Design a protein with these regions (language model features):
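N-terminal beta1-alpha1 cap of cysteine-dependent amidohydrolase-like domains
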Residues: 1-122, 133-140, 144
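Glycine-rich beta-to-alpha active-site loop
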Residues: 123, 128
Length: 144
């Protein structure tokens, strides 16, 4: 019997926005995956593909998140910074916390694209919180 085909699993991108103090890639937004999550998926036999944000100042071509959702077998949403409270209808408890609107919008669009085609969506830490928000849930902003 031939071996089962490997699953193609997307991994949402993490962002490092342009930073003039960064010694390399100054002025450029970086998109990346966290190595241990990619290795965890690979250890289960999956082919792992980062799903880059298709928008921004350097966007080229016509590839969309919908294309990735059709092609891949599922998506894992990365961890990271807290989801901005405005995304679930609340004002931030602390004014200085502005969140990462670019990443929030990207992550919400990824979840929407995969949900529309009925593909599995899994979240790690922030990713799980974001899935909750994408489907209409709310969060506690701070637990003391």
């Amino acid at each position: 019997m031939p071996p089962a085909p490997r699953l193609k699993i997307g991994l949402s991108a993490c962002f490092q926005h342009a930073d003039p103090a960064r010694p390399l890639f100054t002025g450029k937004t970086l998109q990346y995956v966290e190595q241990s999550i990619a290795h965890w998926l690979m250890s289960a036999g999956a082919m792992v593909v980062m799903v880059p944000c298709p928008t921004g100042e350097t966007a080229r071509g016509d590839v969309t998140l919908d294309h990735y959702a059709e092609w891949l077998d599922g998506i894992v949403m990365h961890g990271g910074a807290d989801v901005w409270p405005g995304n679930y209808g609340e004002e931030p408890l602390r004014e200085e916390w502005v969140g990462d609107r670019v990443r929030d919008l990207y992550d919400l669009a990824v979840v929407k694209a995969f949900a529309q085609v009925g593909k599995p969506i899994f979240g790690v830490c922030r990713g799980l919180q974001l899935i909750n928000v994408a489907f209409g849930g709310a969060l506690y902003q701070d637990i003391e």
